[in-house]
């Protein structure tokens, strides 16, 4: 997913 590429995975 693009979210993981942007680093949103760290916000979760």
Curated annotation (Swiss-Prot):
It is found in: Secreted. The modification Arginine amide is found at residue 12. The modification Pyrrolidone carboxylic acid is found at residue 1. Keywords: Amidation, Neuropeptide, Pyrrolidone carboxylic acid, Secreted. GO terms for biological process: neuropeptide signaling pathway. The keyword Hydrolase does not apply. One of its GO terms (cellular component) is extracellular region. Myoactive peptide. Increases the amplitude and frequency of spontaneous contractions and tonus of hindgut muscle. This is Tachykinin-related peptide 8.
